[in-house]
Amino acid sequence: GSKKFITRATTADWLMVVARLDQGEKFIGLLVPREAPGVHISAEVGKLGWFGVPISSLTFSDVRIPVTHRLGEEGDGFSLAQDALLRARIGHAAMALGRAIGAVEIAAAYACERNTFGKPLSTQQGVQWMLADMVTQIEASRALLYTTAQKYDHGEADTATFASMAKLHATDLCMKVVTDALQLTGG
């Protein structure tokens, strides 16, 4: 089989794979060594962002893995994959929040340094409103992210819903804050 858009396959020593067993309905989780015969990893794929994480494709041809490499029990593969996606949503929310924080820090520093009409840009009321809105939204996103992480840590039933909300809010916020920061810094 094959799979596209695999993160870190070119740098990983082991691959976590979720697969079906003998055309059955149950999924299993496996740890596959990258050097196993039949494992083929493509060159890295270019992308528009997230440059620190290599993306590539995987192809498996008659790969044999010992039963000791199985994660959990037969049928646990789907829940393992769901948990990985859940953790990824929380991680993406955190990364987007970090980018937004960085953008507002740069914009605020610039607004304090840049003089317009004989005084710092940061003294302009419209700029203050813009920065205040950016920080307020960042803190709201941070609170949602912390709540989500706490729910994950405690295994609460609504964690997936909160993880999706946190990712949505943080990524939308990141786009807005970065766009506003560009406006404040002259673009």
Model-derived features: positions:
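Short glycine/proline-enriched turns and hinge-like loops at secondary-structure junctions
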Residues: R8-A12, F51-V53, G72
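Gly/Ser/Thr-rich beta-alpha loop segments that engage phosphate groups in nucleotides
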Residues: K3, F51-P54, E74, S79, ...
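Alpha-helical interface subdomain recognition
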Residues: T59, D83-G187
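Flexible, small-/acidic-enriched active-site or ligand-binding loops
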Residues: E35-P66
